[in-house]
Amino acid sequence: MSEISTSAAPTEIKVGRHLFRWEPPDIGYVSYGGDLDGEAAAALSAESRKFTLGKPRVFLLVNMARVGQISKEARSVSAAGSKDLSIVGIAVVGAPGHVRLVVGLVSRAVELMQRTQDSPTRFFATEAEGRQWIAQRRQALDGP
């Protein structure tokens, strides 16, 4: 179900209509294109962990503008897939209101699995706004 795209950078992975791209040094970009079931969520999580596991910190930039239905299994798998990752911020782009509620619940589960309260989730209309927030968050974490 997953494949490494031959037309993109070697750090770009497609799982069905969904995409994960590792953007060094610390951004995991995810774009959902349609319904997300447990099988796709598990494959996406397994592939993305190859890049994110062991990194000192990870920001997630998640494009949900084209997401469809998100199954209960997909929500559980997505939260579990964050275990042992050093996620320090999640920027969600283009999520409609009902999806924001689901994302909020998954984000809370991620925080509980990481046992950290310093992994904020923020919502943005555009990818540029999400990237700007990540840059500001990175600067705040790095200090003066």
Q: Could you describe each region identified by the protein language model?
A:
Residues S2-P144:
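Amphipathic, Lys/Arg-enriched alpha-helical "gate/interface" segment within cytosolic domains
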